[in-house]
């Protein structure tokens, strides 16, 4: 640092700087010392950059979402409500994309609102967040258990939970395919292990269609799940958060179709209707079975699909990263649905900060 410089000028038609030399305080005259003291005092009080705003948020939460996803788990209004609910609780919710992987460790938690899969960035994000000791929903273990239908079926079977009759088909065992009609009857349903939103699922009515559909699916996977077909007008969807029921919906089949989503339809016919109700108004056996199913997965956020036919109740699947759309799943709870989820993040992040185990 050189607080005092002596600048010498010379004039040859115009004034020019001829020298710049550092000098000491002892070289100044009394008037110069007074001028220097005033300048130094003014400089010391000057702000060279704006002060940081006082922190309004206690925690920072990254919400992973894809604006270009044609079937996202949450629509734009729902994402905005998550941000607003977080702010109410002192959580700053930043929407991030797959390009923000290197910035993930800057946050206290990760909330995945993108369709998850083991072979894409969502699983990598979840893994990194867990290794950084962040609060993360969906956690890697839940993604692993839920996104593979064969793994999930074996898990439900081990827990002795009711499911549709199921057989596993292997690409190199054609004999097992030939036995299916006797084992499951027709119609039956074929599923690829990692399908979502009614994709990768085929209903077959006869032997010829069975063989053709299996041949097609085996082009993409070595294993196929075959299940008996349970027709119902709607599926139950029970949202579960930290082992407690959060919401209950009926998802009706797409018009003239056997699934909730009809990917060959256009417009309103693409998905069926819905009915959202208080958890207390849903059948108690539906809620209890949903909780038993998620107990095998973990303590995160899940959506359990169940079918109820006369006196029979069966778990179809447990979804990590369940749909939470404004106007559908929040139709009963409204803003409170988003607050409850953000409050769960808050509790977990507080425990992390205090060094307490979950």
Q: At which residue positions do the language-model features occur?
A:
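Conserved hydrophobic helix-helix packing surfaces used for dimerization/oligomerization
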Residues: 61-63, 188, 201
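ATP-grasp fold ATP-binding core
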Residues: 155-157, 181-199, 221-236
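A short glycine-rich, hydrophobically flanked beta-strand micro-motif that places a catalytic Asp/Glu
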Residues: 2-8, 95-98, 227, 299-310
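Conserved N-proximal alpha/beta basic substrate-recognition cap immediately N-terminal to
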Residues: 1, 11-165
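Rossmann-like NAD(P)H-binding beta-loop-alpha module
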Residues: 164-187
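Phosphate-binding site of ATP-dependent enzymes
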Residues: 202-294
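C-terminal active-site "lid" helix and adjoining low-complexity regulatory extension at the edge
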Residues: 281, 295-299, 308-358
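A short beta-strand motif that forms the metal-chelation/ATP-contact edge
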Residues: 15-22, 107-112, 238-241, 306, ...
């Amino acid at each position: 640092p050189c607080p005092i410089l002596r600048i010498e000028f010379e004039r040859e038609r115009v004034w020019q700087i001829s020298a710049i030399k550092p000098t000491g305080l002892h070289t100044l005259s009394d008037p110069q010392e007074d001028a220097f003291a005033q300048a130094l005092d003014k400089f010391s009080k000057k702000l060279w950059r704006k002060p940081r705003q006082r922190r309004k948020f206690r925690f920072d939460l990254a919400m992973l979402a894809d604006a270009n996803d044609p079937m996202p788990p949450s629509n734009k209004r729902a994402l905005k409500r998550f941000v607003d609910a977080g702010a109410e609780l002192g959580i700053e919710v930043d929407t991030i994309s797959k390009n923000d992987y290197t910035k993930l460790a800057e946050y206290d938690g990760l909330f995945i609102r993108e369709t998850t899969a083991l072979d894409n960035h969502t699983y990598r994000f979840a893994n990194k967040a867990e290794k950084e000791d962040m609060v993360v929903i969906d956690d890697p273990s839940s993604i692993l258990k839920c996104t593979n239908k064969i793994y999930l079926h074996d898990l439900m079977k081990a827990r002795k939970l009711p499911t549709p009759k199921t057989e596993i088909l292997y690409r190199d065992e054609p004999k097992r395919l030939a036995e299916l009609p006797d084992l499951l009857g027709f119609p039956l349903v074929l599923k690829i292990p990692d399908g979502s939103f009614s994709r990768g699922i085929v209903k077959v009515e006869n032997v010829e269609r069975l063989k053709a559909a299996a041949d097609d699916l085996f082009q993409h996977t070595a294993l196929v799940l075959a299940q008996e077909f349970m027709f119902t007008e709607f599926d139950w969807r029970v949202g579960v958060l930290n082992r407690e029921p959060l919401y209950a919906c009926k998802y009706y089949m797409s018009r003239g179709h056997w699934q909730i989503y009809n990917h060959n339809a256009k417009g309103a016919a693409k998905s069926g209707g819905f009915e959202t109700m208080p958890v207390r108004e849903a059948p108690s056996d539906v809620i209890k079975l949903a909780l038993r199913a998620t107990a095998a997965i973990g303590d995160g956020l899940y959506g359990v699909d169940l079918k109820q036919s006369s006196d029979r109740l069966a778990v179809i699947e447990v979804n990590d990263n369940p749909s939470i759309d404004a106007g559908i799943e929040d139709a009963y709870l409204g803003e409170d649905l988003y607050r409850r989820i953000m409050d769960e993040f808050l509790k977990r992040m507080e425990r992390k900060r205090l060094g307490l185990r979950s």
